UniProtKB/Swiss-Prot annotation:
It is found in: Cytoplasm. It comes from the Bacteria. Keywords: Cytoplasm, DNA-binding, Endonuclease, Hydrolase, Nuclease. It comes from Streptomyces griseus subsp. griseus (strain JCM 4626 / CBS 651.72 / NBRC 13350 / KCC S-0626 / ISP 5235). Its EC number is 3.1.-.-. It holds the Pfam family NucS_C. Its main location: cytoplasm. GO terms for cellular component: cytoplasm. InterPro entries: Endonuclease_NucS (IPR002793), NucS_C (IPR048301), NucS_N (IPR048302), NucS_N_sf (IPR049173), tRNA_endonuc-like_dom_sf (IPR011856). This is Endonuclease NucS.
Length: 223
């Protein structure tokens, strides 16, 4: 993790153009290759960012104070440094990730046990499928043999869709798994999250936790 605090301006060139005028900002460069630019008044949300995979070149075009960040689609972030106030790097190592609350963990267990809830013919590959950026809740195959990555939440918001998007970008680089499609599953999915998921070709599934627990209870009573 590299943290840079600098007075800088930022220009984005891609599907549209955007400009951030000169101001003091925090720039985060993460080990996964992502670059994000933050102000002091937007909670955790960046002003602009570039998701991995992307490349960062410092001093592009012979200018020591210019950073150029380019993603695989050719979109660019050009960060013009006027004054660097802080620049430090820390090796954080592999994060263990969030420990799911009881409901999310139980949802994962129930869905893995009754994978046909996702559709007839689905088969489980494994729960907590490990990746370089954290475990995928459920990895399975559909009736056609296509790999499916499932992200589970109690309440599905945009952050969950973004998380699943990152997993899909990574998994689709594996020739043994690709093509991989995504399913965003939650007890409740917010409208904005559903719109974003649909735009990215990610399926949405609303889970009835009480009904799923009822399925489990019936199974236990049979034995």
């Amino acid at each position: 993790m590299r943290l840079v605090i600098a007075r800088c301006s930022v220009d984005y060139a891609g599907r549209l153009t955007a400009h951030l005028p000169s101001a003091p900002r925090l720039i985060l460069v993460k080990a996964d290759g992502s670059v994000s630019i933050h102000a002091d008044d937007r909670a955790y949300k960046p002003l602009n960012w570039m998701s991995p995979p992307c490349t960062l070149k410092e001093g592009a075009d012979g200018e020591a104070g210019v950073w150029t960040v380019v993603n695989k689609a050719g979109e660019k972030l050009i960060i013009t440094m006027e004054e660097v106030l802080h620049d430090s790097s820390y090796e954080l190592g592999v994060d263990p990730g969030l420990i799911k609350d009881g409901v999310e963990a139980h949802l994962q267990e129930l869905l893995a046990d009754r994978i046909e809830i996702l559709g007839e013919g689905h088969t489980l590959i494994r729960r907590e499928y490990p990746t370089a950026i954290g475990p995928v809740d459920i990895l399975c195959r559909d009736a056609n043999g296509q790999t499916v990555a499932v992200e589970l939440k109690r309440r599905g918001d945009i952050d969950g869709v973004e998380q699943l998007t990152r997993y899909l970008e990574l998994l689709n680089r594996d020739p043994h798994l690709a093509p991989v499609r995504g399913v965003f599953a939650a007890q409740e999915i917010k409208p904005q999250a559903r719109v974003l998921a649909t735009d990215r070709g990610i399926g949405c599934l609303v889970l009835d936790y009480d009904a799923m627990r009822g399925i489990e209870d019936d199974k236990l009573r049979l034995f």
